[in-house]
Amino acid sequence: AWSSAIPVERYTAADSLGANKSHRAYYTTTKDFQTFAPAKAFYDPGFNSIDGFIVKRDKNDYVLIIKDNRKPGYSDLFCVSGPSAEGPYTSPSTKFAPTYSEGPCAVKVGDEWLIYFDVYREGRFGAVATKDFKTFTPIDNQISIPQGHKHGTIIKVPESVLLNLKAEEAKRFPQKD
């Protein structure tokens, strides 16, 4: 999936709240990475929305974490759920991150989901913990993100890969006392 500006004439002026473009998430499908189906709107809540991240909680249970990008000064993160990655999705949750947050990424740790996000106007990362994607507990004071880091994704790798990366980091950036 990707987000893009589309011609505003496709939407009403009230939809974009005075902005001269509308942002939506799109997707395509492929079986061979040579030919692709025509692009389709992925999630369209009727207002500018970008930076989606999908979580599969269980069979037929997906959560989309996405940015409400309606107008300058209004960029909040919210969650919607649905029976498949393609939706249809429910009504949005309440916002759970500071205004001016974007680029969400989630990872399951134990019985909680940790959602990380870029609080871009403050030049920092924030995070919340949730079990149900309806109630959120801030955990900013429990995370450490490298200075200058922006949007990111968390992936699982074998421990050997992690150890090799840490060894390479130690060679390239030795600690100074």
Predicted regions and their residues:
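Beta-rich carbohydrate-recognition and catalytic domains
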Residues: A1-G103, K108-D177
